[in-house]
């Protein structure tokens, strides 16, 4: 008797919609676990439903995360509507804007690892079947995506959304649209006598008019755009601001989507392929996004067991043009990107040019190309986003460097460079504070190459962002005349001539450890080279007797971190 189509379909094994939570709901021996779950609201009929972890980095410390409490409620509505049972739990988030320029910044990057570890811990311990991961601050976005990649469950990422721009009324009667970066730059301008204190106060009061992440194409918005390009968040969800009620709709649909992923047996690593990471890199390059995206995408790929390297960034950046006129180097903010159609506009333009892989799977269950066809985004508007025929720069906004000063690599945000070559005289500082003091004293001048070392992942520890010094340099009017180099990081809001992630770092006896005041340093962006112009034999002789400084922290999370963290060239991952 021939087999019918319906019989064949019945023989196909359907994915288990409860692949893990049966460990806590099924069988006589799970009576105690069911009793605990009844206390949080589950009833008899709920034990047959998939359990979805709703992981949120909501807190009251920073405006970046304030909307997440509201969005988590909408996510849970979506999970319920799709036939799942949501269980919300929290994790930490560190505010880079508040922790910048002091000891607190040592704890920023390690928070990425703590977030990933904490989400993994809860998801594994409670045997949750899938997750919706909500984040709003710089390190919480990659931390959540790292957790998704590590766990390889059905997962959807949801961004909190960016803040609206503020408007400062200045002492000369003018009004100026401002973001948080303007405050850092105002400090430098005021210190040099270029701005009155009352204008600094006006900017301070205007930069954060409400909830949401910092508004330019800084790290949070860059990583939200990357998450959308990776396929880990719903199409069109990166750009709407935090206060926009469209976000509640995205939240509900994210809750529905994760249950549908379970029904279809789609997990995070089905989405997080090498081609998906290449799509994310292309979008970051075209936006001229934060250099932190290099560090974070390498780390997420590591968790997904995808071979991604700095060479991939170089390869993609060499063929993807810089198209977005967005802050910190441009004129516009994320709300402007939203007004002209959001990240799908950029993705469709890149797809049409053959610079994006349209076959990559996404959390909708459809491919990138199918999603974009359904949205039908408009063409770039020509102002916020340029057409590929009229780019701001012919190559991507981030350049990977190598050379005698960075054998393993370094990163520069080339979107802000007016010329390809800078040659300057080294001014060497062990730590950011000493460099800030020199700038305030007026001893950093045009033509200097300011070197800030022992700020790497191990040496810092924590690879601090150098926004305080870069903002002060720009505010002092030296943004185009002073080169800054570090084994630390830069904020997504950094502008100026800034080279970071220099590897190997100083504490690992990288060449940056042996620079001296007066050495000549040459940066050639077009040829992707960073060199120290000292006779190699003489420079090598400086290594004799090198001893790195002792660890700054002997207890606590950073003491553990130093023992585990790897080079910035591989994402500063721990293991």
UniProtKB/Swiss-Prot annotation:
Subunit structure: Homodimer.
Gene giving rise to this polypeptide: ilvD
One Pfam family, short name: ILV_EDD_C
Disulfide bond residue pairs: none
Enzyme class of the recorded protein, top EC level: lyase
Similarity section: Belongs to the IlvD/Edd family.
Cofactor(s), by name: [2Fe-2S] cluster; Mg(2+)
Cofactor binding description: Binds 1 [2Fe-2S] cluster per subunit. This cluster acts as a Lewis acid cofactor.
Region feature Disordered, mapped onto this chain: 1-25
InterPro entries registered for this protein in UniProt: DHAD_IlvD/Edd, Dihydro-acid_dehy_C, DihydroxyA_deHydtase, DiOHA_6PGluconate_deHydtase_CS, ILV_EDD_C, ILV_EDD_N, IlvD/EDD_N
Role this protein plays: Functions in the biosynthesis of branched-chain amino acids. Catalyzes the dehydration of (2R,3R)-2,3-dihydroxy-3-methylpentanoate (2,3-dihydroxy-3-methylvalerate) into 2-oxo-3-methylpentanoate (2-oxo-3-methylvalerate) and of (2R)-2,3-dihydroxy-3-methylbutanoate (2,3-dihydroxyisovalerate) into 2-oxo-3-methylbutanoate (2-oxoisovalerate), the penultimate precursor to L-isoleucine and L-valine, respectively.
Residues in coiled coil: none
Molecular functions (GO terms): 2 iron, 2 sulfur cluster binding; dihydroxy-acid dehydratase activity; magnesium ion binding
PANTHER family: DIHYDROXY-ACID DEHYDRATASE DAD, DIHYDROXY-ACID DEHYDRATASE, MITOCHONDRIAL
Binding site for [2Fe-2S] cluster: 64, 137, 214
Record-annotated active site: 491 (proton acceptor)
EC number: 4.2.1.9
Designated name of the protein: Dihydroxy-acid dehydratase
Any one Gene Ontology BP term: isoleucine biosynthetic process
Entry binding sites for Mg(2+): 96, 138-139, 465
Basic and acidic residues compositional bias, start-end: 8-25
Listed pathway(s): Amino-acid biosynthesis; L-isoleucine biosynthesis; L-isoleucine from 2-oxobutanoate: step 3/4; Amino-acid biosynthesis; L-valine biosynthesis; L-valine from pyruvate: step 3/4
Keywords per UniProt: 2Fe-2S, Amino-acid biosynthesis, Branched-chain amino acid biosynthesis, Iron, Iron-sulfur, Lyase, Magnesium, Metal-binding
């Amino acid at each position: 008797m021939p087999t019918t189509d319906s019989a064949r379909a019945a023989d196909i094994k359907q994915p288990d919609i409860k692949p893990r939570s049966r460990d806590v709901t099924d069988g006589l021996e799970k009576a105690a676990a069911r009793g605990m779950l009844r206390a949080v609201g589950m009833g008899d009929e709920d034990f047959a439903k998939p359990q979805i972890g709703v992981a949120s980095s909501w807190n009251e410390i920073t405006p970046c995360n304030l909307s997440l409490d509201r969005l988590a409620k909408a996510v849970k509505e979506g999970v319920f509507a799709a036939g799942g049972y949501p269980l919300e739990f929290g994790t930490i988030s560190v505010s880079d804007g508040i922790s910048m320029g002091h000891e607190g910044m040592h704890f920023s990057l390690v928070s990425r690892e703590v977030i990933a570890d904490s989400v993994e811990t809860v998801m594994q311990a409670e045997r949750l079947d899938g997750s919706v991961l909500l984040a709003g601050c710089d390190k919480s976005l990659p931390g959540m995506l790292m957790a998704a990649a590590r766990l390889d469950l059905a997962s959807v990422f949801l961004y909190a959304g960016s803040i609206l721009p503020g408007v400062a009324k200045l002492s000369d009667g003018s009004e100026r649209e401002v973001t948080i970066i303007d405050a850092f730059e105002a400090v430098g301008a005021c210190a040099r006598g270029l701005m009155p204190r009352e204008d600094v106060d006006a900017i301070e009061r205007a930069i954060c008019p409400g909830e949401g992440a910092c508004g330019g194409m800084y790290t949070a918005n860059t990583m939200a755009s990357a998450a959308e390009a990776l396929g880990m968040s719903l199409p069109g969800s990166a750009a709407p601001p935090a206060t926009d009620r469209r976000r509640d709709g995205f939240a509900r649909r994210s809750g529905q989507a994760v249950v549908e992923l379970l029904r279809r047996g789609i997990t995070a690593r089905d989405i997080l392929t090498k081609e998906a990471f290449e799509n994310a890199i292309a979008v970051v390059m075209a936006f001229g996004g934060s250099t932190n995206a290099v560090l974070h995408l390498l780390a997420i790929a590591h968790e997904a067991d995808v071979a991604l390297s700095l060479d991939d960034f170089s390869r993609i950046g060499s063929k993807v043009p810089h198209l977005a006129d967005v802050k910190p180097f441009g004129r516009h903010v994320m709300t402007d990107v939203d007004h002209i159609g959001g990240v799908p506009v950029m993705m469709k333009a890149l797809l049409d040019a053959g610079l994006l892989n349209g076959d990559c799977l996404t959390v909708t269950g459809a491919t990138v190309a199918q999603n974009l066809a359904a949205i039908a985004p408009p063409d770039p508007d020509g102002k916020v986003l340029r057409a590929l025929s009229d780019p701001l720069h012919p190559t991507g906004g981030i350049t990977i460097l190598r050379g005698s000063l960075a054998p393993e690599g370094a990163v520069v945000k080339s979107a802000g460079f007016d010329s390809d070559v800078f040659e300057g005289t080294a001014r060497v500082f062990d730590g950011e504070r000493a460099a800030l003091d020199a700038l305030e004293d007026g001893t950093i001048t045009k033509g200097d190459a300011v070197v800030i070392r022992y700020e790497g992942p191990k040496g810092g520890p924590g690879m601090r962002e150098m926004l305080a010094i870069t903002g002060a340099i720009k505010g002092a009017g030296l943004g185009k005349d002073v080169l800054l180099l570090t084994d630390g990081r830069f904020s997504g809001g950094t502008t100026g001539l800034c080279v970071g992630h220099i590897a190997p770092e100083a504490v690992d006896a990288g060449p940056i450890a042996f620079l001296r005041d007066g050495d000549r340093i040459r940066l050639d962006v077009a040829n992707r080279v960073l060199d120290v112009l000292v006779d190699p034999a003489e420079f090598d002789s400086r290594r004799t007797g090198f001893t790195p400084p002792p660890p700054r922290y002997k207890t606590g999370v950073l003491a553990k971190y130093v023992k585990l963290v790897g080079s910035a060239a591989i994402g500063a991952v721990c293991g």
